[in-house]
A protein has these predicted regions:
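Positively charged, polyanion-binding regions of nucleic-acid-associated proteins
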Residues: 39-62, 75
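Surface-exposed polar/charged interaction patches
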Residues: 5-9, 51, 55, 121
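Long, low-complexity, charged/polar intrinsically disordered regions in eukaryotic proteins
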Residues: 1-46
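Short acidic, hydrophobic short linear motifs in intrinsically disordered regions
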Residues: 58-72, 78-99
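C-terminal engagement modules used by replication, chromatin/transcription, nuclear envelope/ESCRT
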Residues: 92-138
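Short, well-structured alpha-helical interface segments that form or flank functional binding sites
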Residues: 43, 62, 66, 109, ...
């Protein structure tokens, strides 16, 4: 009720977008872009991963693909671990058509970059077969 009283001409989504942008969690800054995205830093990534994965799964770990499914189902965050499914969701939301580059390739690159960041943080390990496992003490 307070929100609608103070900001009668904006939606809650507009408020969250502005708040996220000013906090540095959402970008790019400015009004030049139609769609905003999460700007992943180590703290935000660690928080999101640890909130999505059950603690009892961490000692043995889960695959990056499973993390992608968890983030998709719990938070509607697409990281590119299943490019076909993620692209389909972006296409349904009419976001894929506005992307200037090869979106499927960008999704796969995004998943690799997130895996690399998790590895440098000590939350994941990539094995010789290319599978990345997220967990403790791997």
């Amino acid at each position: 009720a307070i929100y609608t009283f103070i900001y009668p001409n904006n939606t809650p989504s507009d408020f969250c977008t502005v708040l996220g942008t000013r906090a540095g969690l959402v970008g790019p800054k400015g009004n030049a872009t139609k769609f905003k995205r999460l700007l992943i830093n180590r703290f935000l990534l660690e928080t999101i991963v640890l909130s999505a994965v059950k603690l009892e799964d961490m000692p043995d770990g889960i695959e990056l693909r499973e993390l992608g499914e968890l983030l998709r189902s719990q938070y509607y965050i697409l990281i590119g671990t299943d490019t076909d499914k993620d692209y389909s969701l972006l296409d349904q939301a009419k976001i894929a058509q506005d992307a200037p580059e090869d979106l499927r390739g960008e999704l796969a690159s995004n998943a690799r970059s997130i895996a690399d960041m998790l590895i440098t943080m000590g939350l994941a390990k990539r094995y010789a077969d290319g599978v990345t496992i997220i967990g403790w003490g791997l």
